[in-house]
Regions:
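Nucleotide/phosphate-binding catalytic cleft detector across ATP-hydrolyzing
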Residues: 1-9, 15, 21-138, 148-354
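Conserved Rossmann-like nucleotide-cofactor binding loop
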Residues: 10, 143
Length: 354
């Protein structure tokens, strides 16, 4: 069995290649990058306590972009150092997935750290490409949405974030269903037939909108609310009423001034904005590559479903369940490592037979 680790800036996700161990742990590196030590140490202890026998560890990351690091290069190297420090006592091989889709040892990172930056989406795409030759992979997560075209089994997406963010690429949408500032999606909202500009303050996030709409539960709200410091308990901070109050504040007012109906309307407009953004990306992919089938992953699958339906495209049923969907890059890198080791062993056996 193999372990996959996806180190993000906000969440660290883990999964075993058989899917028996799956978790997403909120670990905001920008608060203190040492938090990654604590998270991975708990993972290590959990593996020991449960007696799970790990043959190897595969790692992908996006956390290097966190502004607790001066540069992304520094971030990649620091994340590697932390992972290596924690797992060196397990006596298993730890390898890192690079932009070419190749597993390499930690020492190789010294040569070109950026070759290992933001590779989590690529692991997911590579695994899917082994099962589907012509498809668009959409992974809508807490912070971003990856839109990855696969044509004839070849991953057509650009390899760097800046290239995928290009206005003509539509491959990286920097919005997700939990952590995105509502002001980044809506510059104006409509209420009671009138149009209002929104405040650019961090008053509300997409998690608030989807909690109000019922698309996520309090348990799904795995990040801090914008005003978490104002509440005695997390339960209070992440109640539906608190979420509506934060949405109302986007218009510099209290909930009493716009009512629940007004807050609900803002939430609907947040969802419409995200769905429409994805519709634009999917339409571009369909026209550019003649693709009409979509595989969805991530906690924001409800956004993907609405966009696919609006375009009358076909949403395929993935081979993984909802638990694995939420941590797909971690599962993918574990599965890819398992496949690679199995192929290597088969090759060695074949050579011995000869």
């Amino acid at each position: 069995m193999f372990l996959g680790i996806d180190v993000g800036g906000a969440n660290t996700k883990i999964a075993t290649s058989d899917g028996s161990l799956v978790d997403s742990i909120y670990a905001p590196l920008w608060h203190d990058r040492a938090i990654l030590y604590d998270v991975l140490r708990r993972v290590y202890t959990r593996l020991e306590d449960t007696g799970i026998d790990i043959e190897g560890v595969g790692v992908v990351m996006t956390g290097e972009l966190c502004d607790c690091f001066r540069t992304r290069r520094e971030g990649v190297l620091k994340i590697r150092d932390i992972v290596s420090t924690i797992f060196e006592g397990m006596d298993v091989e730890v390898v890192y997935f690079d932009r070419r889709g190749i597993f390499r040892h930690g020492e190789a990172i010294e040569e070109d750290p950026l070759a290992f930056a933001s590779t989590n989406w690529l692991a997911s795409a590579k695994l899917v490409s082994m099962m589907h030759r012509d498809v668009i992979v959409v992974d809508c997560g807490s912070t971003t949405t990856d839109v990855i075209p696969i044509v004839g089994g070849e991953i057509k997406a650009k390899r760097s974030d800046i290239e995928r963010l290009h206005s003509h690429a539509h491959e990286l949408l920097y919005s997700g269903v939990l952590r995105t500032n509502v002001a980044a999606l809506l510059r104006k909202v409509k209420l009671r037939g009138e149009e209002y500009a929104t405040s650019s303050e961090l008053f509300a996030i997409t998690a608030d909108a989807y909690l109000v709409l019922g698309d996520i539960t309090r348990a799904d709200y795995k990040c801090e609310s914008p005003n978490s410091y104002a509440f005695a308990t997390e339960r209070e901070a992440k109640s539906r009423e608190s979420a509506m109050r934060r949405l109302a504040r986007m218009l510099c007012c209290d909930l009493e001034e716009i009512g629940e109906e007004g807050a609900h309307s803002i939430a609907v407009q947040v969802k419409d904005a995200q769905v429409n953004e994805l519709i634009t990306a999917l339409r571009e992919m369909r026209e550019r590559y003649s693709l009409n089938e979509v595989i969805s992953a991530g906690i924001g699958d409800f956004i993907v479903k609405d966009a696919v339906k609006a375009l009358d495209m076909k949403l395929l049923t993935p081979s993984w369940d909802r638990r694995l969907s939420a941590v797909l890059p971690a599962y993918a890198v574990a599965k890819l490592l398992e496949i690679e080791i199995a192929n290597d062993n088969a090759g060695s056996a074949g050579s011995n037979d000869c």
